[in-house]
């Protein structure tokens, strides 16, 4: 069973929920379901650990961060396998990109924490204004389901490196790698209570965490609606919010089309398209639109959809049935709105092995001749669906591409 990680040890809960493999639909195991009680324990541990950790020399914190980064690097195969099992992300992406990036996050912020320089400003002959950076205190870190381990380290590394303590709340949809981070942190020498991890649902564990009066700052990655609710709930705390997106890609006629095609395919179809930075709207100058569209659709059709654990797979499974229904719902909307379907669509990918029969697989889907005011161009889909939009040079302007 996946438990909480509080004050340097595993902690159980009275309630549990079941975690599933999105590629097969099979149960992975039970997960502790935390609430206000577990959050209170975790915040208390973080609060108790804060004074000593905040006063630990930056050079010592940096050394511990580098050690944790090295331990993650040593465990890349194991962590990548867990991440793929949990999320449906292709193993070649978790093994070669996401977990190594998690290691790099700790190395990067190990350097940052020893170089936090303030500034001074002479006001007159008798007065000097200066800035001094100090740790905030207990931070609530809320990580999403799509790239859970990498995003968790993206939050944890700067938080801990700069002298804060943390309570990390993972998504209930992808909890497997969380306690691995807790165990590796202890192995690296990070004191108990500095990093605490609570599993559970957003409505219970997440809500209790952001409301807790001893939490001084909140870092949240997830949906825009949830981010707004957190700010309404938590009041005057410090925030770092990474919310929804509908990122544009611009293709001009003088672009290197080979490089542009590779980059555009990567931005939308890597990580199964389940990324807030997905390049889901591609604006293409009219003079090169036919050529770009033809080749882009052909390359999308050649992408390999299949078992996330197979190194050849390029697009894996959606995280849940509910999310699959959302993404396919937008494909239906695109068809109803009159966009031209050039690749993918609603048909299940062909030739999937029998053990993936219950998986949530969607073909890379390409809509061409999209009007930027269509819903598929205005609303975040969070899946392998892209809009190709022809546009004249005079309309390739910021007001056009950011009109969402």
Question: Where do the PLM segments sit?
Answer:
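Terminal low-complexity tails and localization/encapsulation signals of metabolic enzymes
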Residues: 1-30, 63, 67, 117-142, ...
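N-terminal alpha-helical segment of soluble enzymes
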Residues: 22-87, 287
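Residue-level signal for inorganic ion chemistry
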Residues: 25, 61, 83, 163, ...
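Long amphipathic alpha-helix in the N-terminal Rossmann-like dinucleotide-binding domain
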Residues: 44, 66-77, 91-116
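Rossmann-like NAD(P) dinucleotide-binding subdomain of oxidoreductase/dehydrogenase enzymes
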Residues: 117-259
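ALDH superfamily catalytic-core signature
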Residues: 217, 225-371, 390-396
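Single conserved hydrophobic/aromatic residue that forms the stacking wall/gate
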Residues: 395-404
